[in-house]
């Protein structure tokens, strides 16, 4: 009978390495990977992150070293996180063009035209309290924070980012950022939504690297509960609809 054993034998497509490779549904190569880079003020800085062995913070003038090593290995995409020269309650340094991420974007865009550059958009690295938004009466003001995030995203686009990646988990961030970029002539700049970002203890080492640990409280009011699968899917679909 056609379609049944013994005429149909699925193992025919598994017998030889060449055919197995040709029929792979999922192929992961260095070109599929994104390298995070933590950028700091100053010069000649190569500072190890103690909680993440092998990871360093770099000043802008030293970024060529990790970027060139990665590109030689086939990695072409880089996600930039910034540690600013100063912090305040509203994270006002986040959209300044003289800060590490914006400077790094300009340098890398000019020096490595084949690289794809993404700027992380959040306020936690830039606020003195370490939270992802502007605090009013003890809570994050979602809509006020959106205005700051849109300004940060625009500053990254102006500095040369191919895409921006809002990691704050505020409601409506993708829509507001998309509108800001499109209205400013950057419709080709992508928005990489973190979508399903959970309130997880696994972020501990990253917060050390980005110097973004909250000074009080936690981020459970905006990051997803780890128990809620359907909520994560809903958030991801909403981000997709927002652009």
Regions found by a protein language model. Name each.
Residues 2-5, 16, 22, 28-35, ...:
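Alpha/beta enzyme core
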Residues 6-12:
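Exposed beta-strand/loop interface patches that mediate assembly or binding
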């Amino acid at each position: 009978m056609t379609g049944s054993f013994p005429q149909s034998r699925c193992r025919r497509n598994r017998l030889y390495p060449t055919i197995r490779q040709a029929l792979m549904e999922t192929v992961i190569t260095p070109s599929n990977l994104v390298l995070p880079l933590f950028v700091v003020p100053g010069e000649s800085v190569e500072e190890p992150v103690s909680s993440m062995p092998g990871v360093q913070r770099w000043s802008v003038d030293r970024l060529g070293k990790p970027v060139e090593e990665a590109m030689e290995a086939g990695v072409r995409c880089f996600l930039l996180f910034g540690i600013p020269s100063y912090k305040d309650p509203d994270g006002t340094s986040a959209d300044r063009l003289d800060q590490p991420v914006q400077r790094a974007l300009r340098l890398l865009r000019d020096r490595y035209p084949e690289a794809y550059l993404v700027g992380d958009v959040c306020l936690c690295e830039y606020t003195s309290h370490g939270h992802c938004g502007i605090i009013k009466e003890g809570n994050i003001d979602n809509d006020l924070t959106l205005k700051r995030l849109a300004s940060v995203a625009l500053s990254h686009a102006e500095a040369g980012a191919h895409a921006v990646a809002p990691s704050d988990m505020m409601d409506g961030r993708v829509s507001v950022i998309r509108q800001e970029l499109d209205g400013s002539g950057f419709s080709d700049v992508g928005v990489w939504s973190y979508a399903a970002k959970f309130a997880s203890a696994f972020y501990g080492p990253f917060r050390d690297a980005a110097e973004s640990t909250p000074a009080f409280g936690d981020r459970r009011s905006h990051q997803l509960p780890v128990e809620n699968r359907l909520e994560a899917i809903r958030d991801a679909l909403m981000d997709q609809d927002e652009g």
